[in-house]
C-alpha cells in the first residue's frame, strides 16, 4: 500500500515538474510585460528575450513601434518578430506610446499639438533600464516602426543618434524641415518601406494650404544619402513585379540608405498586411543588423566631420565651421558659389572674386550643408 502511494506521489511530482518546466519554457518564449516610471507616468513595454540568451553574451536590441492610436499588445501580434529574434539572437522590445492630451488621450508617439511632450528621453531611459537587466550590445541598438511609429523612428535616428545605430521606418516619410530638428552625429543606416499609393502617408509628401508637413520619399532619401556621404543617385534592383529596391552608396561601395518601393502599395506592413511579395520583418532585420554605432560593419567610413577641404583651385576652411567660412581662390578666375542644405534647398549664393572670400554663415542652424563651386561639391559642417 505504501509502495503504491509512493508511486502515485512520484507520478504526481513528475507531472508537476513537467508542468512547471512547460510554464518556464512558454514564459521564455513569450513576451514579458514590463513598466518603468518616466516623466511622472507609468510607461509600459513588452520585451522578448530569446531562449538562447544566457547573460554571457551581449545581444543587439531592436525597438518596434506601433502606429498612432494603436497599442503594443496588438502590434506585437501584427508584426511578430520573435521567430527572427530566435534565430538571429537579439532582444526585441515593443514599447507603448503615451496618452496624447492634445488628441483625446489616444496613444501617440508624436503629439498632435507640438510641444505637448517629447518621447525621445523616454527611449533613452528605456535603453538604460533594459541594459541594467540584460546584457545588450550598446553599439547595436536599432529602431523600426509603422506609420506614426515610423515618424518616431526618424525622431530616434535624428535626436537619439548617439545611441541608435540604424533605423527602418515603414509607411512614413520625414517631417518637413529636417534641418531644424535632425542632427545625426555618425553614419546611420536607414531603410524605408513605402507604398506609392499610400493615402495616409503620401509618397510625395503632405502639404495642406501651402504648409508642408512631410517631405517626399525622394527628399527623405536624399537627406540621409547626403548625411552618409552617399552618391545621391541610387542604384535600382527589381525585387518582385511590385517591389523595387533603391540603394544609395558611398564612393567605396558601402550602402547606407535603402528604399523598398512598393508599387501601388498602401499604408501597409508588407508580409503581414498589404503587399505579400516581401516580408518587412525579415527585410528590416537583414538591413539594420549590418550596422553598428560606427556605421556599416566592415566598411571604411567617411566621418560626417571632415577636415579643411583643398582642391587644385580652392581651399575651404575651417571645416567644421562655427560662424564664418573662408574660401581661398588659387586662380584669377572668378566663380559663383552656392550653398544648399541636405534636401537641396538653396541657402545662399554669391561670387568668389578676391583671393580670400569670407562668408558669414552665423545664422545657419548646426547641420550639414553642401557648397557647390563649378562642378565641385564640398561637404560643410556647421557646429553649435
Language-model region placement:
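C-terminal outer-membrane/trafficking sorting elements
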Residues: 1, 306-384
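Bacterial N-terminal signal peptides that target proteins for export
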Residues: 2-15
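A domain-start/cap signature at the N-terminus of enzymes
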Residues: 26-61, 74, 87, 115, ...
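Serine-hydrolase catalytic machinery in alpha/beta-hydrolase-like enzymes
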Residues: 32, 36-52, 56-142, 152-155, ...
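Active-site nucleophile loop of the alpha/beta-hydrolase fold
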Residues: 97, 168-175, 195-198
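C-terminal catalytic histidine-bearing segment of alpha/beta-hydrolase fold enzymes
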Residues: 190-193, 215-216, 225-300
Amino acid at each position: 500500500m505504501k509502495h503504491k502511494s509512493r508511486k502515485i506521489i512520484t507520478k504526481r511530482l513528475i507531472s508537476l515538474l513537467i508542468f512547471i518546466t512547460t510554464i518556464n519554457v512558454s514564459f521564455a518564449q513569450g513576451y514579458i510585460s514590463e513598466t518603468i516610471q518616466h516623466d511622472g507616468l507609468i510607461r509600459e513595454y513588452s520585451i522578448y528575450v530569446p531562449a538562447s540568451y544566457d547573460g554571457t553574451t551581449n545581444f543587439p536590441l531592436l525597438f518596434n513601434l506601433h502606429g498612432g492610436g494603436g497599442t503594443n499588445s496588438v502590434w506585437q501580434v501584427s508584426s511578430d518578430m520573435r521567430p527572427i529574434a530566435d534565430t538571429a539572437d537579439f532582444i526585441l522590445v515593443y514599447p507603448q506610446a503615451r496618452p496624447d492630451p492634445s488628441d483625446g488621450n489616444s496613444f501617440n508617439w508624436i503629439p498632435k499639438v507640438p510641444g505637448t511632450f517629447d518621447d525621445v528621453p523616454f527611449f533613452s531611459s528605456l535603453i538604460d533600464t533594459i541594459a541594467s537587466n540584460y546584457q545588450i550590445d550598446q553599439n547595436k541598438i536599432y529602431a523600426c516602426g509603422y506609420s506614426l511609429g515610423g515618424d518616431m523612428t526618424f525622431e530616434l535616428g535624428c535626436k537619439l543618434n548617439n545611441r541608435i545605430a540604424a533605423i527602418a521606418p515603414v509607411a512614413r516619410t520625414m517631417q518637413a524641415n529636417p534641418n531644424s530638428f535632425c542632427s545625426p552625429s555618425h553614419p546611420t543606416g536607414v531603410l524605408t518601406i513605402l507604398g506609392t499609393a499610400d493615402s495616409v502617408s503620401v509618397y510625395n509628401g503632405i502639404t495642406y494650404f501651402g504648409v508642408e508637413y512631410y517631405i517626399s520619399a525622394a527628399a527623405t532619401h536624399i537627406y540621409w544619402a547626403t548625411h552618409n556621404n552617399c552618391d545621391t543617385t541610387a542604384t535600382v534592383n527589381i525585387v518582385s513585379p511590385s517591389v523595387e529596391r533603391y540603394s544609395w552608396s558611398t564612393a567605396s561601395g558601402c550602402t547606407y540608405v535603402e528604399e523598398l518601393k512598393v508599387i501601388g502599395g498602401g499604408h501597409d506592413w508588407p508580409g503581414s498586411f498589404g503587399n505579400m511579395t516581401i516580408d518587412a520583418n525579415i527585410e528590416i532585420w537583414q538591413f539594420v543588423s549590418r550596422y553598428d554605432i560606427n556605421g556599416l560593419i566592415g566598411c571604411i567610413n567617411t566621418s560626417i566631420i571632415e577636415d579643411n577641404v583643398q582642391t587644385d583651385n580652392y581651399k575651404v576652411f575651417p571645416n567644421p565651421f562655427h560662424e564664418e567660412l573662408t574660401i581661398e581662390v588659387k586662380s584669377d578666375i572668378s566663380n559663383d558659389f552656392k550653398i544648399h542644405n541636405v534636401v537641396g534647398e538653396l541657402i545662399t549664393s554669391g561670387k568668389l572674386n578676391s583671393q580670400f572670400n569670407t562668408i558669414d554663415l552665423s545664422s545657419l542652424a548646426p547641420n550639414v550643408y553642401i557648397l557647390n563651386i563649378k562642378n565641385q561639391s564640398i561637404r560643410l559642417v556647421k557646429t553649435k
